[in-house]
Regions:
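Hydrophobic membrane-insertion alpha-helices, especially the h-region
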Residues: 5-17
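Metal-dependent active-site segment of extracytoplasmic phospho-/sulfohydrolases and closely related
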Residues: 64, 289-326
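Active-site His/acidic residue clusters
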Residues: 153-158, 226-229, 245-246, 250, ...
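Active-site proximal loops enriched in glycine and acidic residues that flank catalytic Cys/His/Asp
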Residues: 225, 265-269, 274, 286, ...
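Functional beta-strand-loop-alpha-helix junction segments that form "active/interaction loops"
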Residues: 203-244
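N-terminal catalytic scaffold of extracellular/periplasmic and nuclease hydrolases
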Residues: 19-187, 192, 197-213, 218, ...
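Gly/Ser/Thr-rich active-site loops/lids in small-molecule metabolic enzymes
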Residues: 282-298, 330-343
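Structural motif
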Residues: 56, 184, 222-224, 262-266, ...
Length: 384
């Protein structure tokens, strides 16, 4: 009888392992890259220096192993990415209000409002204000960039207040009523286009991101795909949209004597590739993300009143980097969903030195506001 029980137990365990291995423990081999490191100029900042501007770059689903694999795939283990060259580093906890597992809505709400919420909820908090709303009467102008739809969970947390991230048509309506002046991403299908045109310059062609009409517009909504932006030569990358956004925001802030600007830019599809357990596509998406960081670091070096922060909402896929075989590395995915692994926080610019050690994702909200001394800013509407 004991032997029979043991046999059944072994069969059940084997069946369970096969099921798990088939569905979650996907193995891939990624080539080790040979690109040389591009060393970036990194300036030093006095500890007492304060920023005027904030750039927050998000790698959706980007854990430390997504970064490690991308580093190896670019130039090997000794290669250095742009993100590796940011001088200050910490770790962030990511859990939501009632679950160790977070989704993008809850995590982005933590940055946007400084308060934890339940998964799927967007910035439903006691005082209901996200960073762009807080800063809108403090002389700031704000913009958003995403390679997802601009109504997707992460960007939406910075302007929408709603009980479900999936109500994207309602979220789109809230964007039009928000203080966000520049939005670049996908999501055309969720908007009432006639209503958009009442108060925005609508852009659907990436070639219009550097024209005079774009730079002179008072409010811009760029929608470059029906939902998330498909990667192709006719569609803008995170790098291209973020560069255009920085040109627009810095120009408007200078022309209108604003106190500064706030920009959130998300590389959304690192997460999507990780959900699909597709390491090769993840590396492609990360390359765009890292090039965006490099460009933003150059901006900070040249415009020394800007603080650059880079982090992630959560890790996706439970990615593991296991071994090397000739000129490839073996990687394995543990899940098709998110994990509760802490994520990195990287900082460069005035005020960057405080973003070290272990922090909660809600802390980032308050640290941003403290960095620009928002509590001491006098009421001012930055009209462009």
């Amino acid at each position: 009888m004991k032997k029979l029980v043991l046999i059944f137990a072994l069969i059940a365990a084997a069946a369970y392992f096969v099921s798990i291995n088939k569905n979650h423990l996907k193995v891939e081999y990624i080539s080790i890259g040979t690109q040389p490191t591009k060393a970036l100029e990194v300036a030093s900042f006095d500890a007492a220096a304060k920023p005027k501007n904030i750039i927050l770059i998000i790698g959706d689903g980007t854990g430390l192993n997504q970064i490690t694999l991308s580093r190896i795939a670019s130039g090997g283990p000794d290669h250095r990415l742009a993100i590796d060259q940011m001088p200050f580093f910490g770790n962030s906890l990511t859990h939501s209000y009632n679950n160790i597992y977070t989704d993008s809505a809850a995590s982005a709400t933590s940055w946007a409002t400084g308060i934890k919420t339940k998964n799927k909820f967007l910035s439903i908090t006691p005082d209901g204000k996200a960073i762009p709303e807080i800063l809108s009467n403090k002389g700031y102008i704000s913009g958003l960039v995403a390679t997802s739809s601009i109504t997707h969970a992460t960007p939406a947390a910075f302007y929408a207040h709603i009980d479900s991230r999936y109500k994207e048509k309602e979220i789109a309506s809230q964007l039009l009523e928000s203080p966000i002046k520049l939005s670049l991403g996908g999501g055309l299908e969720f908007f009432d286009i006639e209503k958009v045109k009442e108060s925005n310059l609508l852009i659907t062609d990436m070639n219009d991101l550097d024209g005079d009409k774009f730079l002179k517009a008072k409010k811009v909504l760029g929608l470059f795909d029906e939902d998330g932006i498909n990667r192709s030569s006719s569609k803008p990358t995170q790098l291209q949209m973020t560069k255009a956004a920085l040109n627009w925001l810095s120009s408007k802030a200078n022309l209108n004597s604003c106190n500064g600007f706030f920009l959130m830019s998300e590389g959304s599809q690192i997460d999507w590739a990780s959900h699909d357990n597709d390491a090769a596509t993840m590396v492609v998406e990360f390359k765009d993300f890292d090039q965006t960081i490099a460009m933003a670091m150059d901006f900070v070096t040249s415009n020394k009143e800007t603080l650059l922060l880079v982090t992630a909402d959560h890790e996706t896929g439970g990615l593991q980097i296991l071994s090397q075989k000739n000129d490839t590395v073996k990687v394995q995915w543990g899940t098709g969903s998110h994990t509760s692994i802490p994520v990195g926080v990287y900082a460069y610019g005035p005020g960057a030195h405080v973003f070290t050690g272990l922090m909660d994702n809600t802390d980032i909200h308050y640290m941003i506001l403290d960095a620009i001394e928002s509590s001491g800013l006098k009421p001012l509407v930055c009209s462009n």
